[in-house]
Design a protein with these regions (language model features):
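Active-site machinery of serine-nucleophile hydrolases
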Residues: 49-51, 55-105
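Low-complexity "stalk/linker" and mucin-like segments enriched in Ser/Thr/Pro/Ala/Gly
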Residues: 330-345, 351-376
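A domain-start/cap signature at the N-terminus of enzymes
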Residues: 8-51, 122-137, 141, 149, ...
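Alpha/beta-hydrolase-fold serine-hydrolase catalytic core, especially in secreted/extracellular enzymes
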Residues: 208, 216-338
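Short, exposed coil/turn segments at beta-strand boundaries within extracellular/luminal domains
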Residues: 393-401
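Alpha/beta-hydrolase active-site loop
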Residues: 91-117, 124, 136
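The feature captures the conserved acid-bearing segment of alpha/beta-hydrolase catalytic domains
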Residues: 146-232
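Extracellular interdomain linker/stem segments of modular secreted and single-pass surface proteins
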Residues: 407-413
């Protein structure tokens, strides 16, 4: 299959990505044409150590465009690949997604001159409806997966896939043993039924290395800078502990890491079953400890690389525990007559950020439309943008967040 580039440098209206290829072996149901894979390489990087691979959905865009995340990826020598529209939600190999991926990597290697892309380790990352595919990608690509990031997402082999239908069956022999995986769930989207499959997975696969972070003070839609930093640290630890001199990946042994107690919410009720969840106070929580020394219930604990990662997780939980919730009213917005600007009405103590879509921030109240990478031929995504209003927390209150869906007139419907 021949993959064609849309440009040589600064492809797409955002100017973020340097190279792109059309995935001409796949036709998107959203646009009726091939998706495009965009590649960002850190400035001055001669050879990347790994790439983060995500597909168009929602918060993946926000994470990739965050200056702090790009800064950390540059420090680590890690590239970014974003595909729009997506070519798979569940990574079911019977659909041809594996071949599409492999041809994409060869095409991007050829376009960019970074031949290492043909075999470089991959970090699959997905949010919400895309949060299941990273686990399944790893199960079918265990020797190439550096680590897994399921953001505001799903447990491996979950029965509650973010895309709303059945998961892909792994069979008896497939697993992700020794591959570090990170599941993140927002505090305000908390649902016990999403967490339980992750705990059960560890019992079923005792050689798995599953980390968990409750994104305290956050909901479903947004990524805060401290969470982007956490993800970057997870990637750094993966590189440090797994990447060998010859480019191969060392399998980790969970017994060499740390264990820390799962998150217990202080917001009730949270899972709709009418039953209160067990709540640990800070003093009652079992102390995080090396795997062999952990004194808590191992069935209620998650794995972490080391003391630094386990204690950072505990610190995130302690930061908001016991604080009050101060709801944030949903902001209103207006679109200019020419359809090129959006004005958002928020109080002075609230800031607004872009999650996804064809908007970029001018100031805290003004956002301008630009023809971003998705183009203007996708009825599902080209005319919708998501913003997030944020009131930062303090010593008394948790952070408050409120998503804003902005819909533009769709000329395709005329």
């Amino acid at each position: 299959m021949l993959l064609s580039s849309t440009a040589i440098y600064a492809v797409g209206a955002s100017g973020m990505y340097q190279w792109s290829v059309a995935l001409s072996g796949y036709v998107s149901t959203e646009t009726g044409k091939a998706p495009t894979a965009y590649l960002w390489m850190p400035e001055g990087c001669q050879q990347v150590k790994a790439v983060v691979f995500a597909q168009q959905n929602m918060t993946e865009e926000m994470i990739f465009k965050m200056p702090v995340f790009q800064k950390r990826m540059k420090e680590l020598g890690v590239g970014l690949i974003w595909v729009a529209p997506c070519f798979t939600q569940n990574w079911n190999p019977t659909t041809g997604c594996q071949q599409t991926f492999e041809e994409m990597m060869v095409g991007l290697a050829g376009q960019s001159g970074h031949k290492e892309l043909e075999h470089v380790p991959v970090i699959p990352l997905g949010h919400s409806a895309q949060a299941t595919f990273p686990w399944n990608f790893a199960a079918w690509n265990p020797d190439r997966t550096l680590c897994v990031i399921s953001f505001h997402g799903d447990a491996p082999r979950t029965n509650l896939c973010g895309y709303g239908t059945a998961n892909v069956e792994w069979g008896r022999v497939r697993n992700i043993d020794g591959i570090p995986g990170l599941m993140i769930e927002g505090e305000y989207e908390w649902w016990e039924a999403r967490v339980r499959p992750a705990l059960a997975f560890q019992m079923m696969y005792p050689n798995s290395c599953i980390s968990f972070l409750c994104d305290a003070g956050s909901g479903h839609f947004e990524c805060m800078p401290e969470t982007a930093e956490y993800i970057a640290m997870f990637i750094r630890k993966s590189l440090e502990q797994r990447l060998q001199v010859d480019g191969s990946l060392k399998k980790l042994t969970p017994q060499d890491g740390w264990l820390a107690c799962r998150y217990n919410p202080d917001l009730q009720p949270n899972d709709g079953d009418g039953a209160k969840d067990d709540i640990f106070t800070i003093n009652q929580r079992p102390q995080a400890a090396p795997y062999i020394d952990y004194q808590g219930d191992r069935h209620d604990a998650f794995w972490y690389f080391d003391q630094e990662m386990a204690e950072l997780t505990e610190a995130r939980y302690a930061e908001t525990r016991g604080k009050l919730v101060r709801p944030l009213e949903k902001p209103t917005y207006t679109i200019s007559a020419d359809g090129k600007r959006v004005s958002v009405n928020v109080p002075a103590d609230v800031h607004v950020e872009v999650i996804s879509g064809p908007l970029r921030k001018v100031n805290n109240h003004t956002f301008e439309v630009y023809p971003y990478e998705s183009g203007l031929d996708n009825p599902k995504r080209s005319f919708t943008s998501w913003l997030i209003a944020i009131r930062d927390g303090d010593s008394k209150y948790k952070r408050a967040v409120q998503p804003i869906e902005v819909k533009f007139p769709n000329p395709l419907k005329k």
